[in-house]
Amino acid sequence: MARVKSGKVTRRRHKKILKLAKGYWGAKSKLFRVANQAVMKSLMYAYIGRKLRKRDFRRLWITRINAAARAYGISYSRFINGLKKAGIEINRKMLSEMAIHDEKAFAELVNIAKQQLNA
């Protein structure tokens, strides 16, 4: 049976990892084994970070909506409850943008929510 040499394959794999490790400090950008560990860890952190970003933005939107709703004399939870009862399905991102950029429309939504809660 013929001997299989994997020099080209290994070199390509090493180059790929070292390219991903570019900019890392010290051995993490030079030595394959250390760079491989650093790259694997960084990819793991990136994956987790993409999940956390969604949570963070949702929290930010809710905080903004709450602040804007309280300016009109209603809490966030009562505001959302009123909108649900009114059958208005606007997501929190859009509500947050409306609270910042379109105060008249947001005030209308607050009035609708208050009417539904009083009814």
Swiss-Prot record:
InterPro entries: Ribosomal_bL20, RIBOSOMAL_L20_CS, Ribosomal_protein_bL20_C. One of its GO terms (biological process) is translation. It comes from the Bacteria. GO terms for cellular component: ribonucleoprotein complex; ribosome. Keywords: Ribonucleoprotein, Ribosomal protein, RNA-binding, rRNA-binding. One of its GO terms (molecular function) is rRNA binding. NCBIfam families: rplT_bact. Binds directly to 23S ribosomal RNA and is necessary for the in vitro assembly process of the 50S ribosomal subunit. It is not involved in the protein synthesizing functions of that subunit. Belongs to the bacterial ribosomal protein bL20 family. This is Large ribosomal subunit protein bL20. It comes from Caldanaerobacter subterraneus subsp. tengcongensis (strain DSM 15242 / JCM 11007 / NBRC 100824 / MB4) (Thermoanaerobacter tengcongensis). The gene is rplT.
